[in-house]
Design a protein with these regions (language model features):
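Extracytoplasmic/secretory-pathway proteins
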Residues: 2-23, 28
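Surface-exposed binding patches on compact interaction domains or structured appendages
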Residues: 65-68, 72, 92-130
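Short beta-strand edge segments in extracellular beta-sheet folds
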Residues: 159-169
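Short, hydrophobic/aromatic beta-strand segments
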Residues: 86, 96-105, 142-144, 159
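A short beta-strand micro-motif common to beta-rich folds, especially ectodomain repeats
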Residues: 89, 129-131, 139-153
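Intrinsic-disorder/low-complexity, polar/charged segments enriched in Ser/Thr/Lys/Arg/Asp/Glu/Gln
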Residues: 84-88, 126-128, 155-157
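Beta-sheet-dominated interaction scaffolds and their linkers
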Residues: 23-94, 136-138, 169-177
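Eukaryotic, compositionally biased intrinsically disordered regions
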Residues: 27, 100-104, 148, 152
Length: 177
């Protein structure tokens, strides 16, 4: 019952649940829990205790599901790039609880607006992540880069193709006689 109460509090106010989780008296509350839960708490309550520790505790004790993320689209293309462009893509979350995303890019021409995103930055279940395509960093031909979005449980990749040249389409059709 005590874990259920902590979960209810966390669902309404994660900050308050974190305060309870890190309070030295919580160890006496969890003393009645099964040995696995006590061992889990012992490991996750060691300093420094982060919000992620509370999230992992609730997930591991099956009090809640891990927050999951998805991308609305996974790739985009830009051709005839002559100057720096700012663009964005959408990250969607499902579930409740603490979420920290680490953002990195591969490809010298791509620069995400932020390196870290937290659940507080989502509007409802959506977040628009801005990024910049630096035209001066593009070489000849198509350049392919990625923006990598990592949570403790997932890694998603958003692929960006960019070129200074116009898009070339080759249309191969068989003529019927």
């Amino acid at each position: 019952r005590d874990l259920e109460a902590l979960t209810e509090i966390a669902h309404k106010d994660f900050r308050e649940a974190y305060r309870i989780f890190t309070d030295k008296n919580f160890a006496t509350v969890i003393a009645e829990a099964d040995p696995k839960q006590k061992a889990l708490y012992a490991g996750l309550s060691k300093q420094p205790v982060t919000w992620q520790n509370l999230e992992e505790f609730l997930v591991a004790t099956k009090q809640k599901a891990a927050v999951s993320i998805s991308l609305k689209t996974t790739e985009t293309e830009f051709y005839n790039v002559k100057e720096t462009i700012q663009e964005s893509f959408e990250i969607q979350r499902s579930g409740w609880g603490h979420l920290r995303l680490d953002i990195e890019s591969k490809g010298g021409f791509l620069e995400p607006e932020r390196k870290v995103v937290t659940d507080e930055e989502f509007i409802g279940s959506c977040l628009k992540l801005n990024y910049v395509i630096h035209a001066d960093q593009l070489k000849s031909g198509n350049q392919i880069g990625e923006i990598i979005v990592r949570s403790p449980y997932q890694e998603l990749r958003y692929q960006v193709t960019a070129s200074k040249s116009p898009q070339i389409r080759i249309d191969i059709r068989r003529e019927e006689k």
